[in-house]
Regions:
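N-terminal amphipathic/basic leader segments beginning at the initiator methionine
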Residues: 2-51
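Gly-rich Lys/Arg/Thr-decorated short loops/hinges at beta-loop-alpha junctions or inter-strand turns
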Residues: 15-24, 54-61, 91-103, 120
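Glycine-rich oxoanion-binding loops at beta->alpha junctions
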Residues: 33-42, 82, 87-130
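Glycine-rich phosphate/diphosphate-binding loop of Rossmann-like nucleotide-binding domains
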Residues: 50, 54-55, 61-95
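Short, ordered loop/turn segments at secondary-structure junctions
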Residues: 59-61, 93-96, 133-136, 156-160
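A glycine- and small-aliphatic-rich helix-loop capping segment at beta-alpha/alpha-beta transitions
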Residues: 72-76, 107, 111, 143-154
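A short, small-residue-rich loop immediately preceding and capping a beta-strand
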Residues: 120-141, 152-156
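Residue-level detector of conserved catalytic or cofactor/ligand-binding positions
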Residues: 160-166
Length: 166
């Protein structure tokens, strides 16, 4: 009695489409509009070749001394994303700092978290870099990003300038 061997085919699952492809890879009027709006900012056409769109969530603010240095640092982050083959997009979110917010920044932590979550969720972002530097801003950004469940990198750095009494 001969045994027949059944061929078992293992089908490879295709990698899921990136979130950003739901905006930029479309071949309809909406895809055209999304690409056109982005190209209006000077983004070249080759950025839409399927590379990951990486959001830079920036808490830069002149009202928050521990986040005031992120304006310049964001440019280096953008260059790094480009060198790694990504498409960087920077967006602002609420910045919290105890120095000027009254009565306390803690009252706004959850609001900042919601700002981050909805900004990431609503836009064509495949991963995000969080730029934060205060004890209220850092947890709020991390909480918001965790709610969206995308690859996330945190740059937490505070730079407070000192002065001398003359």
């Amino acid at each position: 009695m001969a045994k027949s061997k059944k061929k078992t085919e293992t089908s490879k699952k295709a990698a899921p489409a990136s979130r950003s492809s739901q905006w930029f890879a479309r071949n309809d009027i909406y895809g055209f509009i999304y690409r056109s709006w982005t190209k209006n900012r000077g983004i070249p056409h080759d950025q839409f070749d399927g590379r990951p769109v990486i959001g830079i969530c920036n808490t830069w603010s002149e009202l928050t001394p521990c986040n005031a240095h992120f304006r310049e640092l964001a440019e280096f982050v953008k260059k790094g994303i480009i060198e790694a083959g990504g498409f960087p997009v920077e967006f602002p979110v609420m910045s919290l700092g105890e120095t000027l917010i009254k009565p306390t920044a803690m009252l706004y932590r959850n609001l900042a978290s919601m700002d981050v979550e909805e900004s990431i969720r609503a836009n064509p972002i495949d991963g995000v870099v969080l730029m934060c530097g205060c004890d209220k801003t850092t947890p709020s950004l991390v909480m918001g990003a965790c709610s969206v469940d995308l690859p996330t990198l945190v740059i937490s750095r505070s730079e407070e300038h000192t002065s001398e009494l003359q």
